[in-house]
């Protein structure tokens, strides 16, 4: 696309800000709160349209608010307080997101992913599973699922995991059986494998807190709005029954609903064995990496009372440097990690301002009035269903979470009977599971969709079927199990 045709992407966020700012201030809101909301909405529109990278959009929004803080961030009463210096206060607010523990947890998890990639451990694990389970097509589907499952806790970029590690391996498998893309032979085995690749990525993105960056963004938004939070262990235990069910059910379900013509064969295990032989035996760096990852997972699950999850990640990264699993250059050159670090911190800052200015509490009270008369369970389920289905309108999980999660949290806070930890975990699971709905919902989706093995009609049909199944199972486990372990 030529730059001359992109001007509207730059103007649209500014137009949204201007339109909202010029509208009458709703009853119950202060003028500065409404102006803040106008800029916040403009940032969300910018994240959706992306005239520049998302991190830049968020940083520009923060800069505008901080510079104009006497009119956007602080009330007249705050400004009138003796000794109140808005310049210092606005700077403190602008950088507050960078001190959030969630930011450092996800940054550490990115470094874990770098360790997996640098040592080759992630590729080795996937190849071993393919070798052991690849004799039957159904078991090959489970090998793809288990590969994603093992990598997910320490790979917070589902794009890096699905498109960067898993896809380059499984794209080599169909041609071994003469299953070619954009050909009638694609249904032989290739279509099943590619569908398993994207559906496994979506499932594992919901299972672990650190499996997808928007999961951590949600926790940051939750904490800024309510001071409540969910630990890594809380998320894992709350998702446990649904996780087990999906991991065991999905490969079989895909096998039934999108059956491959070829049911078994020996070519895939032979290829995997050849690749493993080329890699050689497990080296000392891989062993050290494996030991550190096991230790981190144990502390994340069981060590919450003794050490913060972010501190676990921070310490493990330090050990990875000392043990020369990764180098300092690997850290400073990791563009993906720094990109997520900046946009996630900036979005948490913006969400904190939305709460500090009083917008969240006002919106919550507004919703409380409209939702009165309905049971908390009915409201919670209705909100989850609406949140889930709105995934169709977003091509970015980050924009989706940034735009809708604050409103969902405000709605839950408006009804004290709704258990916030349970509701937020259901919202978090919906982010990952709902990514299966469309071929543009998350980073790996276009990769698998463009593989030539998943025709458009098949993708949309399967996305709707699997999406509905995921939603039903999420609601059931959310109502029956999550309150048991989270409340």
UniProtKB/Swiss-Prot annotation:
Observed effect of gene inactivation: Deletion of the gene abolishes growth by L-tartrate fermentation.
Topological domain ranges for the Periplasmic compartment: 1-9, 114-136, 210-235, 361-369, 414-417, 486-487
Transmembrane segments: 10-30, 33-53, 54-74, 93-113, 137-157, 189-209, 236-256, 292-312, 313-333, 340-360, 370-390, 393-413, 418-438, 465-485
GO molecular function terms noted in the UniProt entry: tartrate:succinate antiporter activity
UniProt subcellular location: Cell inner membrane
Domain of life per record: Bacteria
Induction conditions: Induced by tartrate, via TtdR.
Cytoplasmic side: 31-32, 75-92, 158-188, 257-291, 334-339, 391-392, 439-464
UniProt GO cellular component terms: plasma membrane
Pfam families in the record: Na_sulph_symp
Reaction equations catalysed: (2R,3R)-tartrate(out) + succinate(in) = (2R,3R)-tartrate(in) + succinate(out)
Keywords: Antiport, Cell inner membrane, Cell membrane, Membrane, Transmembrane, Transmembrane helix, Transport
GO annotation, biological process: tartrate transmembrane transport
Family according to the record: Belongs to the SLC13A/DASS transporter (TC 2.A.47) family. DIT1 subfamily.
Biological role stated in the UniProt entry: Catalyzes the uptake of tartrate in exchange for intracellular succinate. Essential for anaerobic L-tartrate fermentation.
Protein's recorded name: L-tartrate/succinate antiporter
Source organism of the structure: Escherichia coli (strain K12)
């Amino acid at each position: 696309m030529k730059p001359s045709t992109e001007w509207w992407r730059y103007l649209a966020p500014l137009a949204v800000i201007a339109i909202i700012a010029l509208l009458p201030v709703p009853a119950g809101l202060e003028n500065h709160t409404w102006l803040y909301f106008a800029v916040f909405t403009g940032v969300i529109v910018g994240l959706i349209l992306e005239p520049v990278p998302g991190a830049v959009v968020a940083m520009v929004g923060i800069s505008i608010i901080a510079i104009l803080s006497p009119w956007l961030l602080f009330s007249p009463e705050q400004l009138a307080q003796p000794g109140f210096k808005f310049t210092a206060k606005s700077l403190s607010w602008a950088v507050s997101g960078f001190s959030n523990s969630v930011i450092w947890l996800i940054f550490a998890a990115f470094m874990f992913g770098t360790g997996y990639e640098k040592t080759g451990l992630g590729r080795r694990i996937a190849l071993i599973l393919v070798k052991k389970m690849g004799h039957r097509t159904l078991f090959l589907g489970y090998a793809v699922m288990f590969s994603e499952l093992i990598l997910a806790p320490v790979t917070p970029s589902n794009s890096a995991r699905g498109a960067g590690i898993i896809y380059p391996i499984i794209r080599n498998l169909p041609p071994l059986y003469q299953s070619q893309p954009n050909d009638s032979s694609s249904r032989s085995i290739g279509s099943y494998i590619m569908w398993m690749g994207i559906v496994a990525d979506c499932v594992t993105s919901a299972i672990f807190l650190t499996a997808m960056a928007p999961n951590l963004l949600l926790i940051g938004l939750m904490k800024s709005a309510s001071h409540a939070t969910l630990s890594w262990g809380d998320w894992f235990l709350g998702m446990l029954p649904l996780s087990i069910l999906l991991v065991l059910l999905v490969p079989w379900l895909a096998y039934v609903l999108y059956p491959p013509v070829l049911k078994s064969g020996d070519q895939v295990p032979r290829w995997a064995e050849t690749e493993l032989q080329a890699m050689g035996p497990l080296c000392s760096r891989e062993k050290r990496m494996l030991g550190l990852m096991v230790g981190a997972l144990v502390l994340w699950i069981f060590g919450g009372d003794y050490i913060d999850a972010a501190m676990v990640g921070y310490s493990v990264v330090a050990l990875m440097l000392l043990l020369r699993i990764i180098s300092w250059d690997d850290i400073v050159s990791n563009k993906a990690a720094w990109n997520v670090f900046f946009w996630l911190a900036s979005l948490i800052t913006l969400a904190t301002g939305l709460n500090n200015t009083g917008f969240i509490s006002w919106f919550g009270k507004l919703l409380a009035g409209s939702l009165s008369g309905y049971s908390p369970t009915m409201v919670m389920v209705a909100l989850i269903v609406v949140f889930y289905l709105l995934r169709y309108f977003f091509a970015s999980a980050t924009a989706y979470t940034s735009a809708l999660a604050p409103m969902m949290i405000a709605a839950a806070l408006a009804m004290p009977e709704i258990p916030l930890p349970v509701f937020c975990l259901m919202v978090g699971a919906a982010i990952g599971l709902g990514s299966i709905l469309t071929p543009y919902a998350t980073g790996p989706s276009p990769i698998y969709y463009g593989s030539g093995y998943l025709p458009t009609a098949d993708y949309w049909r399967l996305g709707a079927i699997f999406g509905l199944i995921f939603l039903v199972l999420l609601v059931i486990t959310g109502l029956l199990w999550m309150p048991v372990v989270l409340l």
